[in-house]
Amino acid sequence: GLASLLGKALKAGLKIGTHFLGGAPQQ
């Protein structure tokens, strides 16, 4: 349903966010 889709998107977003925060150099 919509809730599980939202949960998946949120988890994916968090994964991408932490990847960018941890992997990309801050300028």
UniProtKB/Swiss-Prot annotation:
Gene Ontology biological-process entries: defense response
Taxonomy, superkingdom: Eukaryota
GO cellular component, one term: extracellular region
Compartments, as annotated in UniProt: Secreted
Assigned keywords, A-Z: Amphibian defense peptide, Antimicrobial, Secreted
Expressing tissues: Expressed by the skin glands.
Keyword check for Secreted: yes
Function summary: Antimicrobial peptide.
Family per record: Belongs to the gastrin/cholecystokinin family.
Protein name per its UniProtKB record: Caerulein precursor fragment R3
Organism: Xenopus ruwenzoriensis
